[in-house]
């Protein structure tokens, strides 16, 4: 009882004193010092107080003091509710399940058969057991050194029976118990746990723990400190968690058996408690390389004797020995069999973190699935053969576990030995230990280690298998065995050749073409005269990431092969114009005869013939007007005379050339460079594209490149607009509010039956008035108040007017312009071509015709609808499906947009191209000038030329638009969120017949479809802007329809 109190006081008092030091009162708290002192004094007395209880086998202590108890019995009642029954030491044997405190005899047997009388004591009762130890003289292949807690003494030559008192610890002695210090450790080995018994789940946090049974009760482990073994070798049954492996001293080793082996190979033990042990002959041991026999033991039922315990300990050791070889995280000592693993000289790392290592030592020990990461100048290791380690290896004892299947492996041939008399067993074990240590000791590398030279060294660098994809060209993966560790692969980068020179070559290759694929070769890079990519270089697989104002092009070079430049469109346009200005004049010797496909501008991609039967063409046009050239093109063919009614396609008298001509213009060549833009590039005018016919390219070339301005024509007197007008509620819908206009009767061709009524009654609109073709159900009733008398005019004069004011567009310039016509070959509305199978227009243009079930046709690539044969490349296609926006309001014209899917695909050729769609939600700044095109009226009263014209108008902010429109109407005008305003300049505006047509804004040199003509109050009135559909508000709706149809 006093011992319990002193123990608790020894542990708790330092804690209390530390609390006192921390909570030492300041001078301002002097008045509370006595209170604190009395409180702590009472707390100390309470914690250190103990009490006895008849039911408690130990002593009742305070709950806080149970931390030092070996076991706490919660079901035992104590005098105070705050107390628990505490058992300080391990109970000394409770029936068969109690932990046994055994008596360990020190016995040395001789070659003769002897009978030793032993006194064996158990904890519960002391009984005498007579044990007969039979020692056979059969020689063993290799006597296995054993370390048993009953350590033997080598000084005894006679049969000695010694009874030791029960010890509290079992400590393994060293392998050479000759001096007095070794004998003292052998005595300490008979004690129980020298550390602290902790639960199994906490044992992994110990610096080390012993795995032998009997040290602690079931479910606990003996947790010890490595400092206890700082001057000696580690016992066999010690287990060191991986995180504490670094705490080992270099001179500490873990031996399998530290005591000399007994010379007895077979022992049969008989006890009075019917404990029987049978011996299995040595030849029957197939799966165990240990020379010990496998013992099958029937446990006693009631009492446990010393002999039974000793056998159990021996079998436990055998179990551990059988478990050791399959474990991958074990370090074998020089005295054992199996693979020799060295200690990791770097750091053990797990999983993907191993990729950051300079090298991975596969022969070094790391726990679990971790790898030994060697950084810096660590020596390279060959996985096939390793030299013996320079310091003793460390054996990592395994945890007790079920016996796994052990593969049969023949042990190394030991020297044959026989049992000698007296200390022969000890002498034999010493010889074996010396021989094994000699074999495993460091020595100069003999000639056989020359074998690793056969494994070729990795010519590049080693990568983990999961990182093999990062071995990129021109590096290659080496499939043959190399010096790379297991789980790694060699990436050979020696074949990459010298790095690519950064300096430009002095003499460019004359055969280099700027439009060819990249020229980077593995070893001998060809000179590339192209400029560096001003954008980003990406692989073609990621070309979809190059969008909006950027485009994939071969005009610029990339540093790495297989990549293409994604450059801004403005840079591409500048480069293209620069190349065009550097083209020299094309001087044909005689004017060539009429030719088929155009040859003046060969496309960058494989050439396409856009005109199967082209009309006769004049000589090739003058390519560079800034070069003096007496050659003048002759008058064009009659088919193109109507496009240039004044003076043909000739230029005005020699405009002033720009003075920024590069020096290279002095060279001449007969092969002009092609334009960069192919037919698939959106937002590029038809005058800047490849494959454009020579006759159409002449005027547009000079206008687009050298600033030759067109003559603008203002609204004629027919539009008679006076700014002094009264407010009204009129609203002009710029599409369905016009009468369908008859166009030439060959536009539909074979799309309608020749015997049908509409085909037989087609009439030229030159001799008829609009009223003759006006249906009754075309417009809402409140729109019919406007008199469309402008259609009575005669169009034989071919006045160039369309949108109010503006100017003529060139033939094929606005190549995304589309005309909607009905089955009677009558023009309805404008539209824009956004895909080879998709057309975007205003919803009010098609709602009535869709209700009637009539067919709709589109005309693409036709500059002049009044001509009999149309423009080169023009096509007519039938609309297969009409998608009107689900929220379209025909009264307020909100969401006035429709998507038309064509039956078949439009061929992108001369005069036919696509317009770019804007990004979702993009709005253009107020004041930005954009271009509206269409076939419609020249003024509010007409006439309509049905020829593509353009007008440049400014974007108007929403607030200004609402203010200006409300100033001319009696009704309150509310601008829908999906619409915007543009225009408001007198004489320049869209008008009737332009509905659904495109309003395009230039962004980085490319045109985006900013809006569709919807409606407005009059045409070309000052400060009265028109309303347009905001295309960017419907990008999601458009993409959804197109993606569903493309499935």
From Swiss-Prot:
Pro residues composition bias: residue spans: 501-527, 588-606, 613-638, 650-661
Keyword NAD carried by entry: no
Keyword Secreted recorded: yes
Residues covered by region (CLIP 2): 192-224
Sugar-modified residues: 95, 251, 287, 582, 726, 794
Residue span of region CLIP 1: 54-87
Keywords: Cell projection, Developmental protein, Disulfide bond, Glycoprotein, Repeat, Secreted, Serine protease homolog, Signal
Residue segments, region CLIP 4: 457-492
S-S bridge residues: 56-85, 60-78, 69-86, 193-222, 197-216, 206-223, 344-372, 348-366, 357-373, 458-490, 462-484, 471-491, 533-565, 537-558, 546-566, 682-916, 829-845, 930-1001, 961-981, 991-1019
PANTHER family listed in its UniProt record: BCDNA.GH08420-RELATED, SERINE PROTEASE-RELATED
Protein name stated in the entry: Protein masquerade
Native source species: Drosophila melanogaster (Fruit fly)
Gene: mas
């Amino acid at each position: 009882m006093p011992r319990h109190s002193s123990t608790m006081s020894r542990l708790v008092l330092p804690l209390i004193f530390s609390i006192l030091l921390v909570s030492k009162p300041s001078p301002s708290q002097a008045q509370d010092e006595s209170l604190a002192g009395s409180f702590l004094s009472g707390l100390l007395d309470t914690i250190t107080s103990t009490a006895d209880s008849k039911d408690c086998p130990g002593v009742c202590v305070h709950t806080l003091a149970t931390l030092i108890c070996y076991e706490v019995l919660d079901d035992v009642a104590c005098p105070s509710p705050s107390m628990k029954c505490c058992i300080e030491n391990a109970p000394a044997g409770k029936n068969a399940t109690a932990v046994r405190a055994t008596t360990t005899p020190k016995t040395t047997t001789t070659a003769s058969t002897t009978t030793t009388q032993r006194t064996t004591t158990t904890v519960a009762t002391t009984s005498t057991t007579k044990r007969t130890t039979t020692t056979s003289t059969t020689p063993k292949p290799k006597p296995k050194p054993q370390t048993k807690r009953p350590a033997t003494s080598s000084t005894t030559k006679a049969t000695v029976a010694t009874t030791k008192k029960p010890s509290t610890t079992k400590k393994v002695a060293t392998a050479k118990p000759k001096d007095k210090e070794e004998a003292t450790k052998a005595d300490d080995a008979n004690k129980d746990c020298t550390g602290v018994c902790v639960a199994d789940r906490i044992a992994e946090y110990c610096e080390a723990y012993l795995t032998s049974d009997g040290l602690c009760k079931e479910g606990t482990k003996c947790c010890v400190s490595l400092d206890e073994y700082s001057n000696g070798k580690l016992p066999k049954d010690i287990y060191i968690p991986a995180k504490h492996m670094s705490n080992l001293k270099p001179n500490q080793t873990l031996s399998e058996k530290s005591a000399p082996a007994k010379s007895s190979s077979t022992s049969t033990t008989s006890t009075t408690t019917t404990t029987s042990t049978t011996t299995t002959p040595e030849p029957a041991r197939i799966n165990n390389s240990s020379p010990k026999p496998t013992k099958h033991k029937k446990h006693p039922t009631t009492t446990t004797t010393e002999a039974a315990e000793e056998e159990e300990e021996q079998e436990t050791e055998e179990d551990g020995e059988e478990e050791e070889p399959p474990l991958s995280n074990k370090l074998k000592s020089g005295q054992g069999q199996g693979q020799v693993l060295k200690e990791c000289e770097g750091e053990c790392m797990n999983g993907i973190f191993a990729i950051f290592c300079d090298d991975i030592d596969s022969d070094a020990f790391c726990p679990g699935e971790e790898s030994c990461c060697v950084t810096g100048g660590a020596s390279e290791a060959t996985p096939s053969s390793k030299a013996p380690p320079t310091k003793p290896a460390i054996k990592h004892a395994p945890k007790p576990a079920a016996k796994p299947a052990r593969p049969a492996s023949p042990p190394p041939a030991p020297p044959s030995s026989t049992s000698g008399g007296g200390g022969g067993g000890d002498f034999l074990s010493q010889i074996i230990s010396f021989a094994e240590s000699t074999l495993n000791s460091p020595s100069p590398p003999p000639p056989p280690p020359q074998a690793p030279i056969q494994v070729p060294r990795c010519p590049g660098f080693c990568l983990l298998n999961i990182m093999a994809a990062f071995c990129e060209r021109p590096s290659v993966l080496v499939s043959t065995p190399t010096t790379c560790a297991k789980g790694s692969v060699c990436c050979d980068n020696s074949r990459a050749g010298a790095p690519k020179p950064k300096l430009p070559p002095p003499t460019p290759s004359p055969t280099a073409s700027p439009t060819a694929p990249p020229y980077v070769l593995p070893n001998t890079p060809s000179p590339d005269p192209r400029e560096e990519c001003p954008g980003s270089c990406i692989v073609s697989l990621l070309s979809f990431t190059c969008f909006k104002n950027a485009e994939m092009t071969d005009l610029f070079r990339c540093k790495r092969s297989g990549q293409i430049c994604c450059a801004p469109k403005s840079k591409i346009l500048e480069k293209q114009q620069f190349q065009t200005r550097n083209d020299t004049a094309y001087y044909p010797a005689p004017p060539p005869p009429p030719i088929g496909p155009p040859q003046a501008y060969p496309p960058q991609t494989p050439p396409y013939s856009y005109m199967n039967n082209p009309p006769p063409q004049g000589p090739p046009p003058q390519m560079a007007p800034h070069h003096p050239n007496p050659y003048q093109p002759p008058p064009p063919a009659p088919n193109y005379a109507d496009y240039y009614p004044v003076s043909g396609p000739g230029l005005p008298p020699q405009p002033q050339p720009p003075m920024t001509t590069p020096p290279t213009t002095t060279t001449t060549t007969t092969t002009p460079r092609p334009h960069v833009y192919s037919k698939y590039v959106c937002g590029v005018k038809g005058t800047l594209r490849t494959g454009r016919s020579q006759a159409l390219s002449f005027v547009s070339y000079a206008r687009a490149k050298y600033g030759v301005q067109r003559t603008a024509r203002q609204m004629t007197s027919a539009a008679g607009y006076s700014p002094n007008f009264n407010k009204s509620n009129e609203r002009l819908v710029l599409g369905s509010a016009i009468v369908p206009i008859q166009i030439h009767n060959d536009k539909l061709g074979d799309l309608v039956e020749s015997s049908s009524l509409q085909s037989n009654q087609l009439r030229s609109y030159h001799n008829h008035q609009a009223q003759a073709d006006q249906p009754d159900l075309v417009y809402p009733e409140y729109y019919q108040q406007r008199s469309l008398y402008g259609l009575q005019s005669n169009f034989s004069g071919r006045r160039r007017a369309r949108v109010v004011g503006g100017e003529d567009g060139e033939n094929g310039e606005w190549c995304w312009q589309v005309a909607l016509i009905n089955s009677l070959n009558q023009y309805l509305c404008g539209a824009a071509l956004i895909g080879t199978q998709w057309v975007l227009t205003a919803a009010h243009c098609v709602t009535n015709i869709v209700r009637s079930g009539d067919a709709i046709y589109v005309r693409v690539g036709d500059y002049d609808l009044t001509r009999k044969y149309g423009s080169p490349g023009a096509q007519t296609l039938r609309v297969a499906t009409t998608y009107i926006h689900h929220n379209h309001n025909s009264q307020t014209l909100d969401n006035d947009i429709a998507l038309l899917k064509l039956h078949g695909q439009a061929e992108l050729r001369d005069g036919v191209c696509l317009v770019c769609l804007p990004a979702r939600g993009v709005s253009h700044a107020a004041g930005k000038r954009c271009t509206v095109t269409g076939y419609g009226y020249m003024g509010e009263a007409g006439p309509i030329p049905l020829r593509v014209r353009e007008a440049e108008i400014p974007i108007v902010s929403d607030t200004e638009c609402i203010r200006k429109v409300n100033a001319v109407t009696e009704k309150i005008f509310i601008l829908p969120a999906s619409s915007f305003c543009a225009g408001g300049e007198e004489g320049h505006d869209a008008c009737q017949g332009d509905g659904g047509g495109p309003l395009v804004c230039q962004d980085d040199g490319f045109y985006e479809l900013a809006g569709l003509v919807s409606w407005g109050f009059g045409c070309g009135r000052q400060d009265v802007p028109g309303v347009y559909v905001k295309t960017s508000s419907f990008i999601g709706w458009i993409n959804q329809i197109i993606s569903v149809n493309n499935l």
